[in-house]
Amino acid sequence: MSFYEYIQTFKDDKTPLGELVIWIKEDDSFPKQEKLTENILSYFHQMSNIDHEFLEIVKRSLSLYDQLKS
C-alpha cells in the first residue's frame, strides 16, 4: 500500500491527519505511488511553504504508516 492510499483512510476525519489528506489531495505533484517514508519526508522538506507544525503532522503520519507496514 502506498502512503497516499494509506493516508486516504483518514479522509473526513476532523483531525490534523484529516487535514493532511485534503492538502495531499490538492497537491497535483504528490508522489502517489511512493511507499518509502524517507522519500515522502524528503518531498515535504523540499517545499518552502511548509511550517514546522505541518511537518510534525507529516512525521506523525509517516510513523503510523511505518507501524502499519511492520
Place the predicted regions along the sequence by residue.
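Short intrinsically disordered terminal tails
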Residues: M1, Q67-S70
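N-terminal acidic leader/helix
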Residues: M1-D27
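Aromatic side chains
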Residues: F3-Y6, F30, Y43, Y65
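Short alpha-helix boundary/capping elements
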Residues: K11-T15, D28-Q33, S48-N49, D66
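Amphipathic alpha-helical segments that form the core helices of the histone-fold
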Residues: W23-P31, I40-H45
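Short, charge-rich amphipathic interface segments used for partner binding and complex assembly
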Residues: L36-Q67
